[in-house]
Amino acid sequence: MTTLPRYAVFGNPVAHSKSPQIHRQFALQEGVDIEYERICADIGGFAQAVSTFFETGGCGANVTVPFKQEAFDLADEHSERALAAGAVNTLILLKNGKLRGDNTDGIGLANDITQVKNIAIEDKTILLLGAGGAVRGVIPVLKEHRPARIVITNRTHAKAEELARLFGIEAVPMADLNGGFDIIINGTSGGLSGQLPAVSPEIFRDCRLAYDMVYGEAALAFLNFAQSNGAAEVSDGLGMLVGQAAASYHIWRGFTPDIRPVIEYMKAL
């Protein structure tokens, strides 16, 4: 059995995950060796897979689709962020043997926007497209940055209204949207199949940044749509991915990685 600190990402599917490469770069910055693996848990077998991992020397884990809600249920303790998000993407085994769950997605998004792209969230008007778990997970941290206004919209308006009530933000039907948004964040899953949110091109006319929470080819349709209709800057979610990973790494090891060189490294792969 390895004596190196062991970490893993759990998902299904998970073979595509870039987390091992990212965390390897963080370990190089810290000057340590770690082991980081991908674990594809069976649907219905997540809890057992996590239990086995920690019982055999695991120190910390990332959790991706479709297990973030199960990870929340599995955790013995939760951070305030995780409680607000209702989902967990980071697990750490505490010295007392309990599992603590955290959610670093919002930190990853906010740090990419404010620190890497140097765009302030404070006093800005933000539009969130989508009302699923990905969007819910980032709202608490966005609110901490004190934007002037957060508007949420979704194909099924009732879901947007539900999150609006939960977090004290505004819900507006997609058909009623027009311009006036500084930052537009796409958290819908349509890009994975090339589909665009059913919004007017007019929403981008005042847009400083259009951001897709997914990365790579899946983000291209939305980003091209935004840029061609007036968005000053567009970005996929690679920086969010690296940023949330860095926050997880800090929770596990107390070391804060510099995300900028890792983002550039991942772009070059």
UniProtKB/Swiss-Prot annotation:
Chain residues that bind NADP(+): E80, G130, A131, G132, G133, A134, N154, R155, T156, H157, A158, K159, M213, G237
Catalytic activity: shikimate + NADP(+) = 3-dehydroshikimate + NADPH + H(+)
Pfam families: SDH_C (PF18317), Shikimate_DH (PF01488), Shikimate_dh_N (PF08501)
Pathway: Metabolic intermediate biosynthesis; chorismate biosynthesis; chorismate from D-erythrose 4-phosphate and phosphoenolpyruvate: step 4/7
Gene Ontology biological process terms from the UniProt entry: amino acid biosynthetic process; aromatic amino acid family biosynthetic process; chorismate biosynthetic process; shikimate metabolic process
GO MF annotation, one: shikimate 3-dehydrogenase (NADP+) activity
Keywords: Amino-acid biosynthesis, Aromatic amino acid biosynthesis, NADP, Oxidoreductase
Binding site for shikimate: S17, K18, S19, T64, N89, D105, Y215
UniProt xrefs under Gene3D superfamilies: Leucine Dehydrogenase, chain A, domain 1, NAD(P)-binding Rossmann-like Domain
Entry annotation: catalytic residues: K68
UniProt EC number: 1.1.1.25
Cellular component aspect of the GO annotation: cytosol
Subunit structure: Homodimer.
Record-stated family: Belongs to the shikimate dehydrogenase family.
HAMAP family in the cross-refs: Shikimate_DH_AroE (MF_00222)
UniProt function note: Involved in the biosynthesis of the chorismate, which leads to the biosynthesis of aromatic amino acids. Catalyzes the reversible NADPH linked reduction of 3-dehydroshikimate (DHSA) to yield shikimate (SA).
Protein's name in the database: Shikimate dehydrogenase (NADP(+))
Lineage: Bacteria, Pseudomonadati, Pseudomonadota, Betaproteobacteria, Neisseriales
Gene this protein is translated from: aroE
